[in-house]
Amino acid sequence: MSTAVALSSSTAWYDSPLYYDMVYEDYTKRETRFLHAAVKEYGKDFGESWKILEPACGSGRLLESLAECGHTVHGFDRNRNQVAYAKKRLKKFSSKTKVWEDSLQDFKITKSGSYDLIHCFVTTFKYLLKEKDAVASLRLMSEALRPGGLCLIGLHLTNYKDNPADYEKWVNRRDGVKVVSETWSEPAKIKQRTEAMRTRMTISEKGKTRVEETLWDFRTYSAKELKSLLGKIKTLELVACHDFHYSIRQKRKLNDAYTDIILVLKKKTK
């Protein structure tokens, strides 16, 4: 089997929606169940069908899963390949779905206060490297929510006192395609509040193997820094924290004892 190595870039992973989708496929059912459990646990006046927004929706795997549950789902992503892939998979739901190109820090919606639920998982929020952009994004999410609506954000925290390099690996297969995804994170640069990230996808299909690498930086957050950020958004209240096991019964404190955190934020009522 021949192997071709692709040049590294900042977008390679996202320019290949199928392979990106395969990497995260195993999370979809767990995340869907968790969102329903979170609404039951923390929501009010949701009814059976909700209007949901997913910032940075990627390949649309969660949009599809939630649409299959009868919800109206909207999402955006800044990568046009991901948007096109998501639109194609959601065609069968017609008017109950909407996907468009946009960015986390300055996205536009048709009507403020119209969403019941917003979710942004897999640490996507850390792509915003500047504090002002993180604040702007949270404010836009708050404005998009109705009073009492929920916003769930999942991200990795950084403990600057215990900050080694990290490595994760995923393997998945679909329709004769095998994807091995490996992700490395370097120790955080504390002053800059960034960590260098590298993902290598080894893709095997039709007797050939190729490698695609993606390089980027994440913004880092300690628990204290995340609390400070949330304190700037007066319209959102932190009601609970969970982790990437997606168990509604397993709550976490917002501290540096655990790296994976899911924030459950509620839009305050006036």
Predicted regions and their residues:
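Class I SAM-dependent methyltransferase SAM/SAH-binding core
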Residues: 61-107
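SAM-dependent methyltransferase
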Residues: 155-228
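C-terminal lobe and adjacent flexible extensions of AdoMet/dcAdoMet transferase-like proteins
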Residues: 219-270
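Conserved beta-strand signature within the Rossmann-like core of class I S-adenosyl-L-methionine
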Residues: 148-155
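A short acidic, Gly/Pro-enriched loop at the edge of an enzyme's catalytic core
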Residues: 109-117
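Conserved class I S-adenosyl-L-methionine
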Residues: 1-50
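A short glycine-rich, Lys/Arg-flanked "PGG" loop and its adjoining helix->strand segment in the class I
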Residues: 135-147
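Class I SAM-dependent methyltransferase "Motif I" SAM/SAH-binding loop
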Residues: 56-60
